[in-house]
Swiss-Prot record:
Keywords: ATP-binding, Cell membrane, Membrane, Nucleotide-binding, Transmembrane, Transmembrane helix, Transport. It comes from the Bacteria. It holds the Pfam family TLC. Its main location: membrane. This is ADP,ATP carrier protein 3. The keyword Plastid does not apply.
């Protein structure tokens, strides 16, 4: 038996592998990630709560394909051009500030006055009756401001988290530090999801924060929803400003060594080349290693998109209005955050003790097990109901889907993100910086958009199709892509080991 002092040191190493001298850098980085992930959790719930109850879960696939993917491509072009003219610090302020400005405009100007900007329901219904195959595009046009909010919310994840924050972290930490820092960073950051969920539940509960005279008739009107939305958006903007201040503090007062200050102009100096947009994309295409990282992201995005659509459709059946949907997503965020923090504690030890390969394989394994459980439950829901007697099958389906979503994303945030980011570290600064920009933004959304293409094509050709009617085809795609993901992880591991030597 170990002496108490050694035992507690071992426990500390497992739960908190950060050394005291590293806290000066770790604490602001962790707080910065907490703010960014708070916004991610809140925005994810807001976009779904606006879109699904008013337009249907099926329309999400069209959003991701026809709106989010082109937006990501445009942003990648702009980012590469900015990276050749400005240093990373200024790019960070410009990008995050632009997001925060839009969120304020949406909450205080666009959303409360949407009746002025959106066409009336009679016109939309007449257009849908005349052009049934364009039903979903007409619906997008009818709620164009919701579409804009959806795009900006999706880009927050791809741009601010995956590109800006992790690129900054990858430059600061080497491989050995990343094994210790990244899981704990994620653990602290995911507390932001719990806080976001709590904020959403508080403001969507109604009676506690809304004048009772507004309830119940006005609470689901744009005016009532705006009363709930505006304070949440104000908190989101405040969190974004805090993240920018922390970024400023890290650059100006903590990273005193000029080598550690990330400056995309230095890429040009070191390599004596200035990449154009086309050259940057070619660099990614011609690098098999970067291609494999992109395939990881594509597989995850496609698979989670295939499972999420049917699940959100079921939530709409149970919670058909914005406020109830919002409240459910807030509670979902709380459980997601708790699960993520728990997985982060486990994941940090798996990564340090079992290595990159096992850690990278656990996410697809977790997703395959929980995803298959969800599909089987939906396909055989009546048979399952007959076996277990009289209970709310719709509620049970939503709970199974929620468990699938929580466990899959928890393993993704704790292990997938950390192993993916570690895969970039052995690369040259040039490939890491500009290659990551293309892979993270385009790769992240291409995976979801590929799943969205399959679904949206069906919904366009067959306007009456629903997720229930195409579920068996989604299951087949799920199994094929899961097999490809596992094979790609094994291949990438061999190349990662070679580069680390």
């Amino acid at each position: 038996m170990l002496p108490p002092k050694i035992f507690f040191e071992k426990v500390k190493e497992i739960i908190w592998p950060i050394e005291r001298k590293e806290l000066k850098l770790f604490i602001p980085m962790a707080l910065m990630m907490l703010c960014i992930l708070f916004n991610f959790g809140a925005l994810r719930s807001i976009k779904d709560s606006l879109v699904v109850p008013s337009m249907g879960a099926e329309i999400i696939s069209l959003f991701k394909l026809w709106l989010v993917l082109p937006s990501c491509v445009i942003f990648t072009v702009l980012y590469v051009k900015l990276s050749n003219k400005l240093n990373f610090e200024y790019i960070f302020y410009i990008i995050v500030g632009s997001f925060l400005l839009f969120f304020l405009l949406f909450a205080y100007i666009i959303y409360p006055n949407q009746d002025i900007y959106h066409p009336n329901d009679e016109m939309i219904n007449n257009l849908i009756a005349s052009y049934p195959n364009f039903k979903w595009f007409i619906k997008i046009g009818s709620k164009w401001s919701y579409a804009l909010m959806y795009i900006f919310s999706e880009l927050w994840s791809a741009v601010v988290i995956n590109l800006m924050f992790w690129q900054f972290a990858n430059h600061i930490f080497d491989t050995s530090k990343a094994k210790r820092f990244y899981p704990v960073l994620g653990m602290v950051g995911n507390i932001g999801l719990i806080i976001a969920g709590s904020v959403l539940v508080f403001f969507s509960s109604g009676q506690e924060v809304i004048d009772s005279e507004l309830l119940p008739d006005s609470f689901n009107s744009p005016a009532g929803n705006a009363i709930m939305l505006q304070p949440i958006m104000s908190i989101i903007v405040a969190a974004g400003i805090i993240a920018m201040l922390l970024f400023r503090i890290i650059n100006r007062f903590i990273l005193t060594d000029s080598i550690n200050v990330l400056d995309t102009k230095k890429v040009t100096v070191k390599t004596k080349t200035k990449l154009s947009v086309i050259e940057s994309i070619k660099l990614v295409i011609h690098s098999k290693y970067i291609g494999r990282i992109a395939l990881l992201i594509i597989c995850y995005g496609l698979l989670i998109n295939i499972v999420e659509g049917p699940w959100k459709a079921k939530i709409k059946e149970l919670h058909p209005n914005t406020i109830d949907y919002f409240n459910f997503m807030g509670r979902f965020n709380i459980w997601m955050g708790i699960s993520c923090v728990t997985f982060m504690v486990i994941g940090s030890n798996i990564l340090r003790r079992l290595g990159w390969l096992i850690s990278a394989l656990l996410t697809p394994i977790m997703l395959s097990i929980t995803g298959l459980m969800f599909f089987i439950f939906i396909i055989f829901i009546e048979e399952i109901g007959a076996c277990f007697g009289d209970f709310n099958l719709l509620y049970a389906a939503i709970i199974v889907g929620a468990i699938q979503n929580i466990l899959s994303k928890s393993s993704k945030y704790s292990l997938f993100d950390s192993t993916k980011e570690m895969a970039y570290i052995p690369l040259s600064l040039e490939l890491r910086t500009k290659g990551k920009a293309a892979v993270e933004v385009i790769g992240t959304k291409f995976g979801k958009s590929l799943g969205a293409f399959i679904q949206s094509l069906i919904f366009i050709i067959i306007p009456t199709a629903t997720f229930d009617s195409i579920i068996i085809y989604l299951l087949v795609i799920f199994i094929v892509m899961m097999s490809l993901w596992i094979w790609n992880v094994i291949k990438l591991n061999k190349e990662y080991i070679e580069l680390c030597k």
